[in-house]
Amino acid sequence: LRSPLAALKVQTDVAQLSMDDAEGREKALAQLHQGIDRATRLVDQLLTLSRLDSLAQLDDVQPVAIDDLLQSAVMEMYHHAQQSAIELRLHLNASHIVHTGQPLLLSLLVRNLLDNAVRYSPRGSQVDITLNAREFRVRDNGPGISPQALARIGERFYRPPGQDAPGSGLGLSIVRRIASLHGMQVDFANARDGGFEARVYW
């Protein structure tokens, strides 16, 4: 938490020094607002990981329709993707695929994958979400990542070098933990025809 809090302090100082410069003040306040959003997201993710780590098994499980889950997540992410001119394309190659679990946690798993794909995709590209009988995949059209970085994807706080988009390096760790609690496995790879792909299977 030190880094985002230190950045907030710097941004506050800049805003105070820009009291006589309306444009500079507005820019500093906008950066401060973004910094608060990043810090809030980091705290939320840390709390989520802490709660997940304390779970040995899931309570209140129920049958979850994976196709419905993916459709709901795509609709929730639609506006965010549109802001970056990114098209979300859902391919349902199977239907009535049911997995026992906690709907809220499985929804969080899918949202984290979609958020990651949208965040690191170039403007005007596509994100493909594909459901098959025993798996679903989320693939972006970004540049992919190096083999060295790929080996560490999913580690807590790890972010590949050269990432411009803001992030904490916790989203894919949360995905791995939720998947594990549901008897699922997750693979991360560079897609054969370009982009980065997450595969969740059971």
Give the positions of each predicted feature.
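Short alpha-helical segment of the dimerization/phosphotransfer core of two-component systems
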Residues: 11, 34-42
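Short acidic helix/loop segment immediately C-terminal to the autophosphorylated histidine
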Residues: 16-23
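A conserved beta-strand-to-alpha-helix junction within the catalytic ATP-binding
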Residues: 60-75
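Conserved catalytic submotifs in the C-terminal HATPase_c
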Residues: 62-63, 82, 87-97
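Short helix-loop "hinge" at the ATP-lid/N-box region of the Bergerat-fold HATPase_c
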Residues: 117-118
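Short conserved segment of the HATPase_c
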Residues: 145-157
